[in-house]
UniProtKB/Swiss-Prot annotation:
Name of the protein described by the UniProt record: Large ribosomal subunit protein bL33
NCBIfam families (alphabetical): PRK00504.1 (NF001764), PRK00595.1 (NF001860), rpmG_bact (TIGR01023)
Alphabetical list of InterPro entries matching this protein: Ribosomal_bL33, Ribosomal_bL33_CS, Ribosomal_bL33_sf, Ribosomal_zn-bd
Protein's organism: Caldanaerobacter subterraneus subsp. tengcongensis (strain DSM 15242 / JCM 11007 / NBRC 100824 / MB4)
Gene Ontology biological process terms from the UniProt entry: translation
Keywords for this protein: Ribonucleoprotein, Ribosomal protein
Length: 49
């Protein structure tokens, strides 16, 4: 079952990206390095609901 998640910038706490993930294949929280338009640099983004 795929669920909707938001990715939050760890530096400025903005929800910049929304995506889906398969909970069966990825039970842990997703962490990706993505570009934050508010910080104007690549930062670590973590999964939240």
């Amino acid at each position: 079952m795929r669920v909707k998640i938001a990715l939050v910038c760890t530096e400025c706490k903005n929800r910049n990206y929304h995506t889906t993930k398969n909970k069966k294949n990825d039970p842990d929280r997703l962490e990706l390095k993505k570009y934050c338009k508010h910080c104007k640099k690549h930062t670590l983004h973590r999964e939240t609901k």
